[in-house]
Amino acid sequence: MTGNTERLLIETTTAWGIPLSEHQYAQFQRYLDELIIWNDRFNLTAIRDRSAMIRRHLLDSLYLARDWQTAPANLIDIGSGAGFPALPLKIAYPTLPVTLVEATGKKAEFLRHVIECLELTDVRVLHERIETVGRNLAEREQYEVVTARAVAELRVLVEYALPLLRIGGRLLAPKGRDPTDEIAAAQRALHVLGGEVSACEPVHIPGEEPRSLVIITKIAPTPSRFPRAIGIPARRPL
């Protein structure tokens, strides 16, 4: 990778303690190439500028791993869209088992395509609604980490995410600059579903406005009636 923006990726990930090989940088390059090509057909992202993609997609995703001493046992990503943040994390941590949940067919098709192009292994794409996945006993309470970017407000998101987490697992939820009101509104849902906010951290990406990362830890089993039927969590939040 060459150029000022690519150097920003190299320098920033190094500063975050995420060492990447030339092969991994090449995978990021190919990922963006494919995203730009497919975006003309399917409108996968509103961000068209390559340098902005590196900042707002790649670095924004990799920020989640800046404190990882080792990769988690596994990760599931809700509403994966074009693959952020899960696929950048998979590229950075090749042995990390990753599951992507995407309900839109064209986006699931892109995810499968880019996984094949990058020759990534131990990655699954579930073309399903998240409510369905959360009620599947093969998926329920199986994951150490759930990620979800721009999916739903926090009180809705926790109903999607917490059923998938094992006790002690974490939901990593990137949010806006000040998520105080969202966190307050989610307290009842957290109590019912067995989670608690363990951290709310400022996120600083070079060249971008400050944002935050809300980390929720699962501290108790989620009642079996959650998540509720498709569409209900969003229409009638807890």
Curated annotation (Swiss-Prot):
Q: What is its EC number?
A: 2.1.1.-
Q: Which UniProt keywords apply?
A: Cytoplasm, Methyltransferase, rRNA processing, S-adenosyl-L-methionine, Transferase
Principal location: cytoplasm
Q: What GO annotations for molecular function exist for this entry?
A: rRNA (guanine-N7-)-methyltransferase activity
Residues annotated as binding S-adenosyl-L-methionine: G79, F84, E102, A103, T104, I130, E131, R149
Q: Does the keyword Membrane apply?
A: no
Task: Family membership, please give it.
Answer: Belongs to the methyltransferase superfamily. RNA methyltransferase RsmG family.
- The identity of this protein, by name, is Ribosomal RNA small subunit methyltransferase G
**What is the native source organism of this protein?**
Chloroflexus aggregans (strain MD-66 / DSM 9485)
